[in-house]
């Protein structure tokens, strides 16, 4: 601040008539922290404490008998706590498919290297499709493990519900390296071309869009051409819409120009 500004400020203060009561209230208010900051802080602390208490209760429920297991499993489908993993793993062998399925989802929420092999065994051998579907989802959160090839096989051969989640998890499992991305993209491209379920084809498109930055030529061009082909020729509008969104999100000038040409020529609206 300049000398001139200081002088004007001093003169202005000298001419103020200050009400002592008002000044006292203002000074007291200045000692308080921002109420919004206090609310945010309190909410964060409350949520952390609540999660910790929920996890403690969940651990007790998992250990207090079969009648309470599902309640405990619901806790760890929502919260992460490494203490739960040793209690969840034995539940993968339970005779009740709901318990197995819930344990799988909880392990997806609480990924651990020791869970990979038991989950892969379920994906291969469990007779219940809902359990295998849960495994296909959960393995996407265990992408550092050897899950890529089993997910490819599930996308090739399993029921539609499992294929749906296998395609999504392949985007996670294939995103680690260029080689894995290429392997995952190969099966996703095949399934996009031949799978009978529109929702599976749509998920294949989504997964390919997630992987494309990891791919090298000529695979990258193959993916783009497959997306254009789906946009132009797939029988289901939902799949065509997914392909268009994926192509637009690539933000590649040549691809955007190509889409505009299709619009201009009347092939797209």
Identify the function of each model-found stretch:
Residues 6-9, 55, 105, 137, ...:
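Generic detector of intrinsically disordered, low-complexity, polar/charged segments
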Residues 28-49, 67-82, 86-93, 101-112, ...:
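Structural detector for internal amphipathic alpha-helices that build alpha-solenoid repeat scaffolds
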Residues 131-135, 162-165, 180, 229-233, ...:
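Short, highly charged low-complexity linear segments
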Residues 2-65, 70:
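N-terminal "cap/leader" segments of large eukaryotic alpha-helical scaffolds
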Residues 64-65, 95-96, 127-128, 158-159, ...:
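Short inter-helical turns and helix N-cap capping residues of alpha-solenoid HEAT/ARM repeat scaffolds
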Residues 48-62, 81-93, 112-125, 144-156, ...:
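Amphipathic alpha-helical scaffolding segments comprising HEAT/armadillo-like alpha-solenoid repeats
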Residues 24, 28, 212, 228, ...:
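Compositionally biased amphipathic helical and low-complexity segments enriched in hydrophobic
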